[in-house]
Amino acid sequence: MKQLSHPLGTVYVPGPNDDLSEAYDLYRNSDVTWAADTETTGLNQYKSYFRVRIVQVGTTDKAWILRPEWHMQAINDLTGGDGRPVWWHNWVYDGLGMEESLGLNFDNTFTGAQDTETAFRLIDPRPIMKGGSGHKLEQLGNEYIAYAGKKDARGMILEECKRIHGRECSADNMWVMIPVDNEAYQLYAGQDVFLTARLAEVGMVKLKELQLTRFYEFERPLGWRLAQMQRDGILFDDEWASRVEQEYLDTAEQYERELAEQWGITKGKTAKSYANSAAALIDKFEQFDVVWNKFSDKTNRPSLDKSVIKELTNFGSNEDIKGLANAVFEAKRNHHYAGYIRQMRDELGSDGRIHPNIRPMQAATHRMSISNPPIQQFPRDDARVRGSLIADDGEVIITADYAQVEFRVGAAVSQDKVMTSKIINGEDLHETTATALFGPGFNKGQRQASKPIGFGRLYLGGANGIYKQMAESDTTGYLPTINQVKKAIKAFDTSYRGYYRWATGLKDKTEKTGGILYTATGRRLIVSPSYAAPNYAIQSVARDLFAAGINKAHKMGLGKYIRLVVHDEIVASAPADKAQEIGAQLSEAMSTTFKGVPIEVEWDIKGKRWTK
């Protein structure tokens, strides 16, 4: 059996008939930390070209490189399907990949699966750019194992690949092109095992020291349940999507022509469209006497970001400025929405379904994220993008979403009596800010326009920041002035004094603790800057309540219907004749009471498509 020497241990590369008894003996020894990993042909397990090339298993200093064509029985025996704890780094990726490529049942793999990424996201949620240790295997290895070889191994693989294949090989395709029997590749694979096993031992000690073990035990089954959603995926209507994409492109082209023909905008050498021709647009706006109040950090030229353009579409009575800004805004918006359709098609599995990557603790607040494609960014103001995702045959889409969850959690953690009373009595939480802006006779559109002030102030947002957000997103036509926003903020703070005291007190306390914050559920977060403490505290608790609801829904047998989780919303596909029953059950699973405040759910049957 070939042996390769690595600074952290020995990498064993067995042939088809070599003896693996030592690996089996160590696996059976429950005192030994056992780790595993895979090397694959790509990141999307549901593409037709996806393959698991090797599975590597072992301990802190011994690793075996197993090839599916030779060692399938050993792969099956040594990866935790019997319940023996096996440590992975982002085990969901490897588990789903082995199921799709090798036929290993994902749910069986879960019985023994433990995850170092989950452990270290609990220990320090911050990425490197925010002062944390990061969460990639090589980042954690450099921080906790004091070994910085991972980067060198990647470099060696690329060099080897280029030596063999020349310019044809790149950082993007080297994982497919590098020969499986290349020693640099095998050392890299073995190193993953060494690092994962060593990080597992460090991580479990730290979880215990920080009293976070119960959160790890909570997150483990949650990760499995989210992975089941990823595996099941959601059906994609390509015919609808193609038509919608063309509609967006046609509309964008209409506004592009307007920019060229009506407004005389010329396309710059590097601009992909008239709407991105910054120099020409700035000159044209200045011809209409626009005075700029925001500039690009990189170029120091006037900024044409979304907030600036949106504000100009509501620019007083100057119809030229508003017309030009509207053409720019609509051209960009429609190009952007067409891009979402392309992203869905790029990620489409060979089974005709989208299998998005649902990460349970991606944000610094431990909120979930959904990407590839970025479904949580899909627009709410235009149902056509979401409408590309549909229920299975004979089924309908059901959505279940928390009602004003941030306010409800804010009332619970602050114990503000006025806010709590309004929630319990079903009163309008946005009445205070809407009245301050528009008077007691405000209409529905004006109430909608005032909502960003309440949500912004919940997180101690200032007038300028809240106003910018409103300028970017307002579709009501009732955009207030900055002075009106300041007046509404004062009314909010006066009405909800208890909340304001809690929020400012938490900010001050977090500053004194160096950013360490323990939420109302006991979760440990690291906040920076300290004024973000109320945001972290509320978002994290809301996430824990949502996660508990997901777990409960699965225990009630509803997991087979759930297709997506987006923000605080569950998207399900269920038989039409059972939709009422299943919707009510989802609502029951998600609803709860937290510190005396009801956390309520609104659910709806959408029909065939995930639309309004």
Stretch-by-stretch model annotation:
Residues 73, 577-584:
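Short, conserved charged micro-motifs
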Residues 40-42, 92, 118, 404, ...:
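Short, glycine/acidic-enriched loop or turn micro-motifs at the edges of active sites
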Residues 2-15, 44-207, 431-437:
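Active-site-proximal helix-loop-helix substrate-binding element of RNase H-like nuclease domains
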Residues 587-597:
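A common structural junction motif
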Residues 572-576:
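Short beta-strand-to-loop capping motifs
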Residues 231, 290-292, 310, 317, ...:
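Conserved catalytic core of nucleic-acid polymerases
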Residues 1-22, 28, 35-40, 44, ...:
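Conserved "right-hand" nucleotidyltransferase catalytic core of DNA-directed polymerases
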Residues 45-56, 64, 399, 406-441:
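Metal-dependent catalytic core segments for phosphate chemistry
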